[in-house]
Amino acid sequence: MRGVSVLESSGDTGVGAACLDQDGKTPQFNPVFPATCPYVTAVGGTVDLAPEIAWSGSSGGFSNYFKAPWYQKAAVQHYLNTYVSAETKEYYGQYVNFTGRGFPDVAALSVHPE
């Protein structure tokens, strides 16, 4: 480690940048690299101040290539078990790798910061 921090936008195309896998035929959310890399701090976007909410153009989700790092597993599992219904997980399971590295790591005001 060199002590260099790498921060990267989580993406500006919504949840998955595209809905086709690399073969161009299989429907699958396709999150953008390098935000999905566990060695990068992915920064998502928010909008409004009272209350501050996620910006719909920002991206987030789970990597199709990188497994969830050890420090995310408990928090992601808690989120999925508490806030995502079994029906939702079953339906979206064909499009999302729920065991992949979750992103973004942090979020900041992105739309009309004044």
Locate predicted features.
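Extracellular protease catalytic domains of secreted zymogens
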Residues: 1-114
